[in-house]
């Protein structure tokens, strides 16, 4: 079996990018495109990489050395390719994936790669429909940064300037709006944990807005899961177990779509759909709805769930 070509994708040369992965057919959102076991896993130690590679087949060694090396002079022939191509396994280790390394970067990626410890593999899921002939693209960096910040990180760490659909926009106003949205997402990253404790109603509004502006930036998958699980935990902490159950259900649906039902996260959260009170954070918490009075203006079920109407995109009129 050729791992570089299946019924749904193939790895081919991409102009100005080296190799890349192209969809051969339309890939619906939620499709697991592939799962891959790491060739090497390490804490970025050159000697460890060299020793691990020596145990691999000649074909695997050659495939490793064909990978792009953004740091040949400073990191050498082993650490350089690893640093330039590895995907995160956990907080301490990265993994070298020969197939995964062929996915190029985009600042609004169409796939989400996730380490699945139960499978001991990285899984790659489509976060939106991918058309036949479209490149399959992941992200190498934290995308909640401005255009200038992203370009600096990509050039310094990965040796290239990004010309994706987000970065190639020339109109000043559109780029400024994108930067403002991503700056707001970064703010939510820093403040949401505290907000969920001290201002739960405001936090629910912010979580809904967080998902909305992420989608405006064509960022799907990761933040959907994070925001829904934050909303679930918020409701548990404050005793709104009816809402907690709904958010647990929404969260498991998002995890199923973007990571798979074999995800540890899915198995962990799904049990709270029927019994949110069994969560450790619910111990000793009295049942108390977050919104004691019905708001006549929130007749829509989603508005009622989040306790607010969906905010307009406040950045679209930015000068």
Curated annotation (Swiss-Prot):
Q: Known catalysed reaction(s)?
A: L-lysyl-[histone] + S-adenosyl-L-methionine = N(6)-methyl-L-lysyl-[histone] + S-adenosyl-L-homocysteine + H(+)
Q: Name one GO cellular component term.
A: chromatin
Q: Which residues form the SET domain?
A: 4-141
**Keywords assigned:** Chromosome, Cytoplasm, Methyltransferase, Nucleus, Phosphoprotein, S-adenosyl-L-methionine, Transferase
Q: Which compartments is it annotated to reside in?
A: Nucleus; Chromosome; Cytoplasm
The UniProt entry, under Pfam families, shows: SET
InterPro entries (alphabetical): SET_dom, SET_dom_sf, SET_domain_protein, TPR-like_helical_dom_sf
GO function term, MF aspect, one:
protein-lysine N-methyltransferase activity
| Residues recorded as bearing Phosphothreonine in the entry | 318
Q: Which GO terms describe its biological process?
A: chromatin remodeling; methylation
CDD domains assigned: SET_SMYD
List Phosphoserine occurrences by residue: 316
What broad class of enzyme is this?
A: transferase
Main location (coarse class): nucleus
- Might you give the EC number(s) for this enzyme? 2.1.1.-
Function description:
Histone methyltransferase that monomethylates 'Lys-5', 'Lys-8' and 'Lys-12' of histone H4 (H4K5me1, H4K8me1 and H4K12me1, respectively), thereby controlling gene expression and remodeling chromatin structures. Monomethylation of 'Lys-5' of histone H4 (H4K5me1) is required for subsequent acetylation and formation of N6-acetyl-N6-methyllysine (H4K5acme).
UniProt record similarity statement = Belongs to the class V-like SAM-binding methyltransferase superfamily.
**Which named protein is this?**
Histone-lysine N-methyltransferase set5
């Amino acid at each position: 079996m050729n791992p570089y070509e299946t019924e749904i994708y193939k790895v081919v040369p991409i102009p100005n990018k080296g190799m890349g992965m192209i969809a051969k057919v339309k890939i619906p959102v939620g499709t697991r495109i592939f799962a891959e076991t790491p060739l090497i896993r390490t804490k970025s130690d050159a000697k460890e990489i060299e020793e691990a590679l020596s145990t691999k087949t000649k074909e695997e060694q050659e495939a490793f050395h064909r990978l792009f090396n953004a740091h040949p002079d400073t990191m050498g022939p082993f650490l350089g390719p690893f640093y330039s191509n590895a995907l995160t396994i956990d907080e301490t280790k990265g993994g070298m994936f020969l197939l995964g390394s062929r996915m190029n970067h985009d600042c609004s990626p169409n796939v989400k790669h996730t380490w699945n410890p139960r499978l001991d593999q990285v899984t790659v899921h489509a976060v939106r429909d991918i058309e036949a002939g479209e490149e399959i693209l992941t992200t190498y960096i934290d995308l909640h940064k401005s255009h200038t910040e992203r370009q600096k990180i990509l050039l310094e760490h990965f040796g290239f300037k990004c010309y994706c659909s987000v970065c190639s926009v020339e109109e000043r106003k559109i780029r400024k709006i994108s930067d403002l949205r991503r700056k707001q997402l970064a703010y939510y990253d820093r403040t949401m944990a505290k907000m969920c404790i001290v201002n739960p109603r405001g936090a629910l509004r912010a979580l809904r807005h967080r998902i909305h502006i992420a989608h405006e930036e064509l960022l799907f998958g990761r933040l959907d899961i994070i925001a829904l699980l934050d909303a679930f935990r918020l409701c548990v902490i404050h005793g709104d177990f009816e809402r907690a159950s709904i958010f647990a259900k929404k969260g498991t649906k998002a995890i199923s779509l973007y990571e798979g039902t074999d995800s540890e996260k899915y198995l962990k959260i799904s049990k709270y759909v029927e019994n949110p009170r069994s969560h450790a954070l619910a111990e000793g918490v009295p049942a108390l709805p977050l919104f004691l009075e019905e708001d006549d203006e929130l007749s829509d079920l989603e508005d009622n769930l989040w306790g607010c109407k969906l905010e307009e995109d406040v950045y679209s009129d930015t000068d």
